[in-house]
Amino acid sequence: MRKSKLHLLPLSSKRVLVSTSLIMLLSGSAWAVSSQETVENGDAITAVPQQRRTVKGIVKDANGEPIIGANVIVKGNKTIGVITNLNGEFSLEVPSNATLQISYIGYLNKEVKVSGNQVSFNIQLEEDSKTLDEVVVVGYGTQKKANLTGAVSSVDFEEQTKSRPITTVSSALAGLSPGLQASSGSAMPGEDNTTLRVRGNGTMNNASPLIIIDGMEGSLNAINPQDIENISILKDAASCAIYGARAANGVILVTTKSGDRDKIQVNYSGRISFNSPTRMIETMSNYADYMELMNESCENVGSGTLFDQKYIDLWREKSKDPNGVNENGVPNYIAYPNTNWLKELYSGGMIHEHNLSVSGGSNKIRFLLSARYQDNEGIVANTDNKPYFVRANIEANPTQWLTLGTRTYASQMDREVGDFSNANTFLRQSTAGTYPEWNGSFGYPECPDERATANNPLYKLARNDGFKRYNRFNTTLFSKVKFFKDLSWDFNFNYNRYIYETRQWGVPAYQTRFSDGVIVDGITPPSQLSTSFGYESNYSYTLENLLNYHHTFAQKHDVSALLGYQEFYKNYYTVDAAKKGLIDESLNQFDEATEMTSTKGATQDYATRSVFGRVNYAYNSRYLFEANFRYDGSSRFHKDHRWGFFPSLSGAWRISEESFMENTRTWLDNLKVRASWGKLGNSEIGNYEYMSVYSTTNAVFGNALNSALYMGAIANSLLKWESTTSVNFGIDVNLLKNRLSISADLYQKKTDGILYRPTIPYVFGTMTAPRQNLAKVSNKGVELSLGWRDNIGGVNYSINGNFSYNKSNIDAYNGTYERTWVEDPNNKLTGGKWEDNIGKVSSGGTTPIVEGRMMNEYY
C-alpha cells in the first residue's frame, strides 16, 4: 500500500510557514498544509484520496439568457475552475461535496453546493446594483450614488495605496477626478505644497478647497495615506453649500477606515522604492565651450571678452587627458573641471516605509489602530524627511439607541533644513569650471577670469545645518442618540493642535582652489556664526450639533432633513529669534551665542458661528430634489457685515426609471440628468483687516536707532463677504450591466466682490492699501469621465479616464488695460513711442492681474 509520509520542511519553508501561521492566527482564520508525496516506508499516516466527479451546467442572467465568460471555481481552491463557453455552459471535475462559486461582472456572486448524485446544474445570477446603490460621502452624511443631484466625484483611495507608493495625499490625487487640478511647486520630500484647485481659481485670495477629514477640517499632510478609505470631491454649489463660507473653492472629503465587526485583522505592509529625476535638462558641462559662449555674448553687447583665450585652450588641452596630473600633482579632472552641476545636486534617494494596523470588533464595538513610519532621503543633499503617523478610530454601541466614539490621529515630521529653492538659486550661479568637493574641502572656480559671483552650490548648502519638526494632534469625540427610528441627534467635539519648531545654525566650511591648493574662502570663525530658533503654535476647537430625520412615506416618497449648529475658534502664536557669535563651533545651542540680532513674535485669533440645513426629497427613486442653506458669521468682518446667507437648489431626473424606458433595461442601467444652482461665500483674508493695526519698525532719532510704531495698513470697516454663484448641468449614464459608466458636466461660476488690495500711490509710503470688495472672476468649463470594468478569464480589470476644460477670466479689477501711440518729435528713429497704463490697472508681477484677461496668465 502506498502511504503519505510526514516530512520535514526545508528551513526557508519553515520560516514562511511559521510567519504565515502567526498572521492567520491573529486574523482569526484557520488553514492546513498537506503533502501529496508518497513513499513506501516509515511511520505513516494513511492518505485517503478524495473522490472526484464531473459536473456540468449552464449559467444564465436574470432574463434567462446564457452568460458567456462567467467564472466557475471550487470554493477554497481557485486552481480548479473554468469559464463558461459561448452557450453559457461549463464542465468541471470537482471533489465530492465541493461548493461552486459563480461570478461575473455586473452580477452578484452565487454559491452552489455539489451534493448527492447531482451532476447537472441550471444556475441563474441576479443583477448587482452595487454601482447604483454605492454610498457616496457628502457634506454631513452619505447618499446613494444614484440619488445624487450635485457634481460629486468619488475616489477609492484604498485601491490607490495598493497599486503605488504614495508619499503625500494631495499629490496622489492628480488625475483621479475631473475638475481637480493638482500641481506640485516643489519636490521637497514630504512637503505638502501641492496646489489643489477645484474648477479653476475662483478668487484672487486663497483658492484652495476646504479639506474635511472624518467630518472635521484638517490637513492632508497630517494623515496616513494607508488609513484613507475613500475621498469625495464636491464641485458645485449644490454639493458645497452645506459648508457655506468655507466651501467657495470646493470641498475634499476624506473618510478613514473602520474595523470590521465580525473579525480581527492584523496587517503589515512594507515598501522600498527609489526616487530619482526622470529627466534633466542638458547643461553646459564643457567649461571651454562655456567660456567661448560667454565671450561671444560679451562681444554682442559691445563689451570686451571675459575669458582669455589661453584659458580656453588650456582647458581643451587638459580635458584630453583627465587622469593626468598638473605641476602640483592634482588630477586634471579636478584642476581643470567640467562639472555637470545638475547631476551633482540631484541624485537618487531611497524611500522605505512601514505600515502596521490592527482592526476588528464585535456587535458592541469596532476599532482601527494604525501606525506608519517612512524615511524619504530626497534627491538633494540635506532634504531627508521622516514622518510618523498614529491613529485610533473607536466606535462603541453600549445600547441600541446610543453610539459613542473617537477618531484621533497624530503625526510628527522631522525634516532636514536643505531646500530645493536654495539649490536652484545656487545652481543658476554655478559654472562647470568648479569642482564640487575633494579631500574635505569644497571647490572654488579654477579659472582666474571667472566672475566673483560664481557659486559652488554644495558649499552654499553645507554652511547651514539644523532641523524642522512638525507636530500635529487631532481628536474628535462623537456621540449619536437615536430618539426614534427616523430621528437622531449627533454631537461632535474636535480639538486640533499644531506645533512647528525649527532650529538652524552655521557650520564651518571652506573653499579651495584645488589646482594650486590655495584656500580662497577660509573657515568662518565661531564669532561670525549664527544660530536661530523659530516656534509656531496654533490650536482650534469645533463644536457641532446635528439633527437628522429620514422617513419613507407610502414606499415612494423618501424624505430626509438635516439641521445643524457649529462653533469654531482658532488661535495662533509665533516667536522667532536669532543670535550671533558662538563660543565654540560645536556648541550651537541658543544660549551659547553672545549677541542677539533679532526677536519677534505675534498672536492672532478668529472665530465663526454657523447654522445650516438640508432637505432631500425623492419620488420613487425617479425625481430627486435637494435644498441647502448655511448662515455664517465671521469675526474677520465688522459686526455690521459679519453674517452671510448661502443657499442652493438642485434636482435630478432618472429617466431610466420611467415606464417608457422599459425596453432599454437590458442594456441601459441608469440615465440621469442633473441641474443645480447655488451661492457660496469666502472669508479667506487677514483676521483684523476691518480694523486699524500698528506695526513695529526702526527709526533714527537723535543719531540713534529706535523702535517705533506705525500704521501698517489702512482699515476698511465696510468689508463684506465674497460671493460665488454657480450653475451646473450634468448627465450620468451606466450601460451594459454597469460595465460602462459615463458622466459629463457643464458649469459656470461667477465670484463677485472679491476681497483684494489695489495698487495705491507712493505718497502713502510703506502703508499697505486697504482690502476692498473690488474684483470679479468667472470660471466656466466642461468635465467628462469614462469608466469600463469587466472580467477576462477570471481576471477583473477596470479602465478609467477623465477630461477637464476650464477657462478663468478676470471680469473686473482696477480698470481696463490701454496702450496708445504717442508722437515724440525728439525721437528721430520712430517718431514716437508706445505708452500704457499697466502699472496703474494691474498687479502681480510675471502673472499680472489684468481686467479682461485670464487668471495666472504669464506677462
Ranges and model annotations:
Residues 267-331, 791-859:
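Conserved small-residue
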Residues 91-93, 171, 214-241:
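Short acidic/polar hinge/loop motifs at secondary-structure boundaries
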Residues 78-89:
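Short, acidic Ser/Thr/Gly-rich low-complexity loop/linker segments typical of extracellular
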Residues 159, 208, 352, 387, ...:
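Extracellular/periplasmic, surface-exposed regions of secreted and cell-surface proteins
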Residues 1-54, 95, 108:
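Cleavable N-terminal targeting peptides that direct proteins into the secretory/outer-membrane pathway or into
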